[in-house]
Amino acid sequence: MGKLSILSKRKYTMKNQIQFSTFNFKDLPVRVILDPKGEFWFCGTDVCHILGYTNSRKALQDHCKQGGVTKRYTPTKSADQEMTFINEPNLYRLIIKSRKPEAEPFEAWVFEEVLPQIRKTGKYQLQPQQLALPEPEKKFSFEFTEYELQQLVWLWFAFMRGIVTFQHIEKAFKALGSNMSGDIYGQAYEYLSVYAQQTKS
């Protein structure tokens, strides 16, 4: 099931005490009405968009029974707009007719999470999830003899001299027009990159 979250929840009280709420399924809004009888109605346009119906009006006409379709003035950012809402049976009809992969997780979200939680608690909200802490960087410890440490120092010294040597050789080969100048420059660049990484750590 994809990541589910609440976009917002707004209560809009009318004379008949209809409650409007807006939830999010995978960042897509779903406007829901809870009427005085305790029945849920879902915005047809929102549902059709999630389920992949390109023509929401046609989808509602073809797959929904008119007894479970109603129009309500719905609060929006600009003003109240008349929108079509469908009941639970019609919502299920749209889900089973959809060929989009999101249909199954959307059905589970609505009927197994949102509606049961609202009926039980009067609201729907996500359960807080514990953030995974980043894994600490792995550290290793080694033991060296005095001779091995001396060899490491000389190896580093030779490495540093190699950088300077490659830089001089590259200039000489480039002046001669040799094709080897590019390869030498590449090795010098790799040496410098390793040096830069080590000096940062």
From Swiss-Prot:
Residues 15-122 form the Bro-N domain. Pfam families: Bro-N, P22_AR_C. This is Uncharacterized protein HI_1418.
